[in-house]
Amino acid sequence: MKVLLLVLGAALCQNADANPTWANEAKLGSYQDAWKSLQQDQNKRYYLAQATQTTDGVWGEEFTCVSVTAEKIGKKKLNATILYKNKHLTDLKESHETITVWKAYDYTTENGIKYETQGTRTQTFEDVFVFSDYKNCDVIFVPKERGSDEGDYELWVSEDKIDKIPDCCKFTMAYFAQQQEKTVRNVYTDSSCKPAPAQN
């Protein structure tokens, strides 16, 4: 309850800068530590449960079944394997990306994630944490450009909660999506999004 009241309080405050209303380190920074959250990816698979966008530069058009696992390869640096489908791909496809953290909206603690695709044609993307409970879910902001208060939202959920997403996670996603009049869609559709168990 305390988390939800803080979120609502921050959303109602007007910021003189172009920062999103939730970009308030003093009040909400303890729920937006990027590296603290990313360390959870080393222990379990996370699924993109919901999103407000339909197209991604890597996952393609009408992407679905997006999930990620990661392993640490350096100080605050991860090697991530992302699985996804889209309207042209009915089988899961892999994308390998290097993930680091950065400071967005003048924060003193890293609250953003930078993804760099691996391979001959690299692409770089930057997202920002809106909320993390550091065990079940993350709400991520995908800005139109660095420093913008306009963009899309994503809800990532751990593998052990994807079939029963905690209400606080769904509420936070829905609340900020409607602030920008965005429509939330389900990216995780059903159990067919889960990769087949590894064969021994």
Swiss-Prot record:
The keyword Secreted applies. The keyword Signal applies. Histamine 1 binds at residues 37, 56, 59, 97, 125, 138, 154. Keywords: Disulfide bond, Glycoprotein, Secreted, Signal. Glycans are attached at residue 79. One of its GO terms (cellular component) is extracellular region. Expressed in salivary glands. Belongs to the calycin superfamily. Histamine-binding salivary protein family. Contains 2 sites/pockets that bind histamine with different affinities. Site H (high affinity) is indicated here as binding to histamine 1, and site L (low affinity) is indicated as binding to histamine 2. This is Male-specific histamine-binding salivary protein. The lineage of its organism: Eukaryota, Metazoa, Ecdysozoa, Arthropoda, Chelicerata.
